[in-house]
Amino acid sequence: GGEVIEALQKSRNTGYTEFGGGGFSTKETLLQIADISELKPLNLENEIAVAHGTHALSLETERYFGKITDFDKLIECGQLMQNVVQQFIFEEARRQKPYCSIVSNWCFNEPWPNTGNNSLICYPDNTKPAYYAVARACRSVLASARYRKFVYYAGETIDFDVYLLNDSLDKLPDGIV
């Protein structure tokens, strides 16, 4: 199938609720579950990862980044995917105003240690990079790019639209973002 980025910009909803973009938990949270050696490989073949996992185990990191053998790099790439998806969804909902009037992701914080999910804060209080991506997407004034997809290959033209999103009550001077 396609990417959520492609599907979302084709939809027109009055609100986007209970969505998410999965990402691995922080290394601190993962170490509360087991030693890194026990978590490898962090996929559906690992009993510990499955017992403490959610749909984040189905992240298509290999599709986007190739085969990753380094544990820290795998976590980083999985979290990057979550950042991109979460930020894109929040920005896309803002681009669809005034028709779309609400955007609310499924899970702000996670109440138990797991290998990954949609949360922005993982158990017990470890902030994931996606939290900051969503915070950036929710700034009052934002230059926002609507790119067509996440993956571009050599020779493809990157195609995107640029929006100036202004939810402040102030008129912005020319040239200020």
Model features per residue range: what roles?
Residues G2-G175:
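Substrate-binding clefts and catalytic carboxylate motifs of secreted carbohydrate-active enzymes
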